Design a protein with these regions (language model features):
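Alpha/beta catalytic barrel-like cores
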Residues: 1-70, 75-77, 172-320
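Eukaryote-skewed repeat-based solenoidal scaffolds used as protein-protein interaction platforms
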Residues: 55-215
Length: 320
């Protein structure tokens, strides 16, 4: 189930626009709703959702507009523990299921525990421990994650916990092979999950192959690149010095290197096949190909989770 963090929509100062877009994409499926904590991605109306006044009245009313929304309990630094707990209890009563998102391991755990013990049933909540970007610091982050899980389970043994992280870098240049056009990026999220004890300890989660920091759009020349998801890595093809036609060349190389994408039944694979025959209508920008990577990554993680759950082995070709 996705966690969607709302921020400002381009050319709009109304956070409702972002919610409407999210509801449109999700159709009638449930999703977990949060609000960005990055001030640069707020708009005037989104700041109001974080106000602790009247027990977070603005956020509660906002989340009550659709039955498919599972709200994240807001825990800004300005809020008192009592206000956060009241918010959690009211949301539990109104929505049934709620979520907590622990970003700061030093302050958010206590806020979460105080709220969990005040609920009618702590099992109505899922607790996300969001570790952010983990590449280069896996050992320390693993230890911190285990300690956080232990703190929660000591007080609430029945707590439902999921650990979120991402290892996708902000730049792929350090992962290029000698040709400067392709390379592999190792996926660390699954390794982290196993190191903390696997599914017996926490539910697997990640950032969908998105870097943890959202950068504002920078006007300038881009390098066409297409990324695909493998079992334990992302593979990319990039074409420095080319314009959008570089996506066509990258797609051709991906299908030559990994021909199973010729028959994979996913939207992302279909976009790669289209590009390989020269059809990049509506796909001429990097943002479109990030969406392809996310789609392929999510499909791969669902496949891997099902394999782990049911304990069966795929053919080697299927797990490429």
């Amino acid at each position: 189930m996705p966690v969607i963090s709302l921020g400002k929509w381009p050319r709009s100062e109304e956070i409702q626009v972002s919610l409407d877009k999210s509801l449109e994409v999700m159709s009638n499926l449930p999703f977990i709703l949060d609000v960005t904590k990055d001030n640069s991605h707020h708009c005037a109306s989104s700041f109001e959702l974080l106000s602790p006044e009247n027990g977070f009245k603005n956020w509660i009313e906002f989340c009550s507009r659709n039955d498919n929304i599972i709200p994240v309990v807001q825990m800004p630094d300005s809020a008192k523990l009592r206000d956060i707990s009241i918010q959690a209890r009211v949301l539990e009563e109104l929505k049934g299921s709620i979520a907590f998102r622990i970003r700061n391991l030093n302050t958010d755990i206590n806020k979460t525990l105080t709220s969990l013990v005040s609920m009618n049933s702590p099992e109505n909540a899922i607790v996300f421990i969001d570790l952010g970007y983990i590449r280069g610091n896996v050992s320390a982050i693993t230890a911190a994650a285990i300690n956080s899980i232990n703190q929660i389970r000591t007080e609430i043994p029945e707590a439902i916990i999921s650990v979120l992280a991402t290892s996708f870098p902000s730049s792929v240049t350090n992962f290029c092979r000698e040709n400067g056009q392709s390379g592999y990026i190792d996926v660390i999220e699954r390794e982290l999950h196993q190191n903390i004890g696997g599914s017996d300890v926490a539910i697997y989660g990640d950032h969908g192959s998105i870097h943890s920091v959202v950068y504002d759009n920078i006007i300038g020349r881009y390098v066409p690149r297409i990324d695909i998801a493998l079992n334990d890595s992302w593979y990319f093809e990039r074409r420095p010095g080319m314009n959008k036609e570089g996506f066509i060349e990258a797609a051709k190389s991906i299908l030559a290197e990994y021909p199973h994408y010729q028959r994979e039944d996913s939207w992302g694979a279909a976009m790669i096949r289209n590009a390989a025959i020269g059809d990049i209508a509506g796909m001429g920008s990097p943002a479109k190909w990030i969406a392809v990577r996310v789609n392929l990554h999510l499909n791969k993680q669902i496949e891997l989770s099902e394999a782990l759950q049911y304990g069966f082995d795929h053919d080697e070709e299927d797990l490429i």
